[in-house]
Structures are given as structure tokens and as C-alpha cells.
Amino acid sequence: MVRSSASLGEDLTMQDRLRFQTLDSYQVAKEIARRVHVAKISDSELRDQATRASKSCFLQLCEGLPSESAAMRRKYFVCANGSLHETVGAVDLAVTLGMMSEEHGDAIQALALRLKAMLWRLRR
């Protein structure tokens, strides 16, 4: 659980979060980034690429979700979608080359399919 620096020792509840942090797309993108990190891809370059892409996907989504401008939302969601595809490609390659477990790869792939559908709807 996230800790509030303003009130040390008190757990944040869903009511203490910004509205966009409660959305499924936010939670799924964050879980993808977490799983890429936990997967510990054995090749350092590919691990770095997958990690950066998954973080970029999450952060682009975070910039777009609270935006009130339709054009800016679309821009951020298109960028998040590109980073999501980069993440999936890096994970798929890592699994193919034996640099991470198929189990981790399958879990990330399943989450990516969910997020892809959400990003497509958010862009509209």
C-alpha cells in the first residue's frame, strides 16, 4: 500500500488518491510495469528496454488521463500505446530467447491485451 509522506504511518485509501489512480487502465498499466520489473529479464539491454517501455506506457497514461484537452489525451494515449507495443515486443523476444520465464511473459501479454483495448477506447 502507498504511504503518504504528509501523514507518516497512515495508509492511503482509495478516497485519498487522485481520481485517475482508481481507474482500471491505471491499475493494469502499473501492474504491467511491476511484472516487467519482477521478471528480471536476464539480458541487461533487453531488460532495460522492456523496463523503460513499460514505465513510459504507464507515465504517458498518467499524463493523459487527467487532461481535459481531447487532443492532449489522444497524444498521450497514442504514445502509451506505442510504448505498450514496445514492452510486448521486448517481453516476447525475452521469452523466445530464454531470458525470462514463459509464465511471466504470458501474464504480461494478457495484461497488455486488456490495456490495449482500454487505450483504444480512451483515444476516441
Task: Please identify what each model-predicted range represents.
Residues 1-124:
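Amphipathic alpha-helical assembly/interaction segments
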